[in-house]
Amino acid sequence: MYFDLTDEQQAIKSTAHDFLKARFKSERVREIAASESGFDEAGWKEMAELGWAGLALPEEWGGQGLGAVELAILFEEMGYALAPSPLLSNTVAGLALAFAGSDEQRERWLRPLAAGELRGAPALLDAGSSAVPLQFELEAEASGDGVVLNGEKTLVMDAASADFFLVASTDGRRHIVERGADGVTVKPEESIDLTRRLSSVKLDGVEVGAENTLPGAADDYLPVFHRACVALAAESTGIAQRALEMSIAYAKDRQQFGRPIGAYQAVSHRCAQMLLETENSRSAVYGAAWAADAEPQSLPLAASMAKAYASDAGWRVPDMAIQVHGGIGFTWEHDLHFFLKRGRANSASFGDAKWHRERVAEAVLAGETAPASA
């Protein structure tokens, strides 16, 4: 595997870093976190103008046609900046339409989504369920040519600002439901992460025409799930990188007993462990992203490896960073708690570390291996 970024990939990284640094300064992130909407509409429009809404979506449907490596680059920078944005949920919805939608559905929903004119969000987890990824309990009852949906989805990312949802039913199908449709109720849910809002979506006799049920079957969404895991793992890696850099800067600047605290092994060894976990997470993420583009048969294992490791690194590194900072790190006024909370929230989304380690164990025992070029 060639680990260096191409010139185009480096340009994406530099552009994303500079834009997010300017747009989402600490003060602005705090303002957004305290707002009712929880995201920056103007910032979203600028992201759409940069082509991010359709970065990994097919060119024929208005996207940029780039791959999972470019997607990972972008989401690592999103995590580094702790950007409050519906980009992740929108990207996952777009990928689902790209992989499993009909041409008519792609024209109606995917093209404006890729342009940033519409926002979609996957509605997967059923309220009161065991929260096992890829298992759904909501029944889609046949009604004429369409179906009727009754049930409640929980922990739906960015639901309050989405124009439509892709609702998963027990047969693995996805159904397009507009947020303003009759029988749809969206309510905010509590989350430790104020920079990414979650909501419940209640469906009470919601009628879905045949034209709004995606033709794809359950297995058609596996590539979408795995890419979502890679993107989220990349975001957690960016969180870890930012926490590491904050800690190193503080360890160099903070004086205790006439010396920078970084001169003491208790601090320097902790920073070394943070570096180790961040770099290992990054290696796993880009190995999985490479597999998605070049060796898709290895993607399920590689994606679970990346998500398992990054799920831990995304909160462990900020947690260690708080320890390096001492008392100031525990205060609301310091930014580290935002990174810790996003890392914790990310660790539980799209399967936690335990679930993904079980998938890795199953794959290894079945004789599967990591990407051949990794």
Predicted features by range, described:
Residues 1-85, 100-105, 112, 116-117, ...:
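Alpha-helical interface subdomain recognition
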Residues 65-74, 132-136, 178, 207-208, ...:
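Structural signature of FAD isoalloxazine-binding scaffolds in flavoprotein oxidoreductases
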Residues 92-101:
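Helix-loop "lid/cap" segments that line or gate small-molecule binding pockets
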Residues 93, 118, 134-136, 161-163, ...:
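A generic structural signal for well-ordered coil/turn residues at beta-strand boundaries
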Residues 116-127, 167:
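A short, Trp-centered hydrophobic/proline-enriched beta-strand micro-motif
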Residues 123, 150-187:
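A short core secondary-structure module
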Residues 135-137, 155-156, 179-213:
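Flexible, small-/acidic-enriched active-site or ligand-binding loops
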